[in-house]
Amino acid sequence: MNITAEVELEILQRESFRYFIHETNPENGLVRDKTAPDWPASVAGVGMALTAYPVAIERGFIKRAAAIERVLTTLRFFWNSPQGPEPDATGYHGFYYHFLDMKTGRRAWNCELSTIDSAFFLAGALVAGEYFTEATDEEREIRYLADALYQRADWLWMQEDGSAVSMGWTPERGFLPYRWEGYDEALLLYVIGLGSPTFPLPQSSYVNWTSAYQWEHSYGYDYLYAGPMFAHQLSHIWVDFRGLQDAFMRKKGIDYFENSRRATLIQQSYAIDNPHGFSGYNAVCWGLTASDGPGPAMRQINGVKREFFDYVARGVPHGPDDGTIAPWVAVASLPFAPEIVLPTIDYFIHQIGLKAGNPYGFKSTFNPTYPCESHTAYGWISPWHFAINEGPVLLMIENYRSELIWRLMCKNPYLTQGLQRAGFSGGRLRATVP
């Protein structure tokens, strides 16, 4: 790199943290989902902000007092916000709507009460509770509210019929017809739900979730399949899965951390193979995940008719793939495979200039294949930054550098209880008495 890797990573972290400073409503702590005008807040983004403040304090990006004020504002808002079946509430049964109005904090867009986004929020609250441990009134209140918010979530209600957890609920139609079954980002959701002291999920729910797992072989690796890369990353923001194995992973002889490493290496191998012949793919230019894109559009390019998508769950190796690369998702694999991620970061920054002119580091995606007038090395680039892209960049870099979030959450008894009830053993649980 032109400057040391350590300095480059800290610059990326600082740039990503700026998102949570400038795209947050200081009156309620709500974080804008993306940088589009009049866009609502993302509950998952709030969870990442709560996780980001301890990192920012440790890195000198924000004063402790300023961070405490922001965290307290956020937790107070969510604790006191309207909970009920009304269609304009903020949440219900301790869960929260996927998107909230930035000013009022009420439900936006008739969206669903989201279990996964609520899980990310609650994980962020628990991080805050573990970090702010001083004997001041403010930090005591942070700990109290983090605990109270976590205990209020009624996971049994969201399980509904005794099988896997529902993806959500709406006042108009009740529970969504979709369940968290099969490997994805819901690994964290189940650990958090199983650890609840008030409304814990039954252990059978985790068995139901893992029963739909797909074990596959791709580019020389056996691994637990999930197409979009983010599914292999987000739970690892909060949980250090190194050495931890549930029943499924014990049979396979690996852990979820190693599985995510393999998924990262498969992403790179897929880009090198480039089976569909897209522009730009190579060993240091990869990263397919759920993201926005240049479509919807059909274009004839060099005699080939290609379809381009807007937001879609792009994935490897089965697709969909339209040549759209998400730089943030490559960065978020840093703890798993630094030997391929660091050169990729260097390429994105110094070879094709992906950060140039951006206020918050990398924008969400780019597509060198899609025809555009820029004539740059990266071709089309998304106009937007997203909270749930900026968060993993900041937080997974920190886990690589200091393991701060992992160390904080290792101390949380609810997380330990959730891991044990999911059947995990090994790793840090060896030193834990049930």
Protein language model annotation of sequence segments:
Residues 1-434:
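Ser/Thr/Asn(+Pro)-rich, low-complexity disordered segments
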